[in-house]
Every structure is written in structure tokens, then in C-alpha cells.
Amino acid sequence: MQADPLFTDEIAIDLETNESRIVQKEIYLENVSEWTPENPVLYGIQPMDDLIERFGFREIKVSGKYILLNGRPIRIKGFNRHEDHPMFGCAMPLQAIEQDIQIAMDLGANAIRTSHYPNDELFLDLCDEQGILVWEESHARGLKEYHMQNPYFQKQSEDCIREMVMNHKNHPCIFVWGILNECASETLYGRDCYTKQYRQLEELDRTRPRTSASNKHKNDICLDIPEIVSFNLYPEWYSDQNETAVDCIQDMMQWIRNNPVTRNKPFIVSEIGAGALYGYHTRTKDKWSEEYQCIALEHQLRAVLESAECCGVFIWQLTDVRISRERFENRPRTMNNKGIVDEYRRPKMSYEIVKDIFTSYDDYFETNL
């Protein structure tokens, strides 16, 4: 059923042959319904040429260590997701994208990070419809300082950011913009790049906070710039096996709260996880077994979600994905095998562990702000 329109208007436009024009108009609407994960209300714009652009009304704000969605402190329970499929590669059709979102929702997730590039408009449309929050980020990841010194790097980054924001800013699901995953944020040259790109984001869109997933941890010198602090942490996988997930997470949270630059900012664990080969089982719960992934993920997720000092987590990752053949070391099958489901979307043992943990925590923090 189609509801009565909130607002109608006509704008007369005269165009010459082969001429194109951009038309902008600001309007003020009253008595609108908020877009929330529980009730993702969408409104549409329908020009006479049949282009339909949908949007939603919601407010994203940072207040101290919390991210507020319509005034309520949201707890992020999310996944990192690559656009990759064994049948379709990165050109995934609507049905395959829908399947990924349904898997994430069944697991109890309320957010997805587009690691590490802007995503298909179909994906964002579906997240708008289903009430899934999205961290969308530009296409730059794992770069050393010498990579960032390439004379084409900054312009390409700026072009990507501009296209991402201008094309996708009307999607209410996007709650944060990200840049430069695991890049040279510990160097002065890197800081200059981060500063320029954060400034560009602010100029393009002041309604959303900014962040960057860092693996430089206590050596990062760019944490004063964005509104949200995000770290990629892999306790009980890459790190010293004697360091527990609880020790790692608590140490990082304590450092963040003791650091004058970060103590009053929200903190997100932007990546965490462990690998498992689908169908590989061992009684001794060795690395790469489905049993070990269950143990590591349970330790990691409970360490993060039990703390009110962290406003959320993105598991690395939703599905197993292909990687470069040159990076075969520590990558069986030349795949990143940290998915909760494999590349064919078959669930591993950890599926039920993650689902049980995610669904046991509310989507919002109980706090008086």
C-alpha cells in the first residue's frame, strides 16, 4: 500500500539538446518517522523520469565513549565483509548479496563493515531496508609510507572518497565513514595523508563521524583527528599465545582511556577473529581446526562485549574469501579462512557460538546520558 506523500513540489527545468544539469533543493519536513534498526522507515523521492531515490531520517552523534543513534547508545555487533563469491567473483548478483545479509542477521549482527572499499549500491539498499548499520570506507588498505608517497596516491584517494560520499550519503544505514585501513598512521608523512583525507570527509559530510581501522595500536599518531578510535586486534591468533584475549582487550582499553587524545572517544574493535578450515576437526583443538576457532572467538567476543568501555566489534570476517596468490604464507588454500561460513556459505562450528553471543547482548547500552 502506498501512503500519501509528505511533500510534493514541481521545478521547471529547461534543457537544450545533450545538456545536463544538477538540480538541488532543500526542504523542511515535519512529523517524520525516525529510521532505526528496529523500524527502518524509508522515504522516497520520485522524479518524473522514474528515478527513485530513497532515504531515511535518523541522527548519528558521538557523545563521550558512545555512538548515539537517535539519542540512544548503540552497541555494534558486526562483521567485516568482502564482495567475493566462488561463483560470481566480486560481481555478486542481488540474490547472493541478500544471502550474505540474511546470514549476518541470523547471526545476530546489526552492522557490516565494507572492508576495504565502497560497496555495491544494491548492498546499501538492502541494508537500508533491513536496518543494518554500515561502516563504509574508501579503497586504501595495508599501505606503507612509500606506497603513500606515490604521486598518484593522494588524488586517487580523494577521488574515491568524493565518489563514495556523494553517491552514498543518502543511505541512512551508513553511520560512519572510514579511510586508510592499516596504513602508515605511525609516520609523519602518513599523518599528513590522514589529515587531508579526514578533512575532505568533513567537508563533504558533517553528519557522520569518521574513523580508520588501525593496526599501529600504541604507536598510532593520528588518533586525535577522527571522532572514533578503531583498532584491529587478533589475540589468540597472531599474537603471543600466552596473551589471552581478555588481557589483550583490557590492556588496549586501559591505554585508550589513559591517553588524553583518546580517553573521551568511542572505541570500536574493527577486526578480530581466528581462522578455521571448513570440515577440519581435531580432538586437540589445534589451530586451523573448527574447534580452535570456536574457542578463540568466544574468548575474543566476550572480552569485548562484556566491557562498557568498548562500543562494539566487527568480526573478521563473515565468509572465507580469496586472496592474492603471492600471499600463500599462513593462508591455506590461498584463502583468508577466518569466515564464520566458508566461501560457499556453509556454516562452521563457530556459527552457533557467534550467534549465541551476539543474540545475548542488547543492541543498545543501558546508560543515563
State what each model feature region is.
Residues 1-134, 160, 166, 173-176, ...:
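Secreted/periplasmic carbohydrate-active enzymes, especially glycoside hydrolases
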Residues 33, 82-95, 103, 107-115, ...:
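The substrate-binding groove and active-site-proximal loops of carbohydrate-active enzymes
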Residues 86, 123-124, 146-147, 222, ...:
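Short Asp/Glu-rich motifs
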Residues 117, 139, 180-184, 206, ...:
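Catalytic metal-binding/acid-base residues of hydrolase active sites
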Residues 128-133, 147-158, 162, 192-193, ...:
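Aromatic- and acidic-residue-enriched segments that line the glycan-binding/catalytic groove
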Residues 131-138, 228-234:
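Short hydrophobic/aromatic-enriched beta-strand-loop microsegments
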Residues 147-168, 252-258, 262-263, 269:
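Ligand-binding grooves and catalytic loops that recognize ribose/phosphate and carbohydrate rings
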Residues 173-177, 198-200, 211, 219-226, ...:
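Substrate-binding clefts and catalytic carboxylate motifs of secreted carbohydrate-active enzymes
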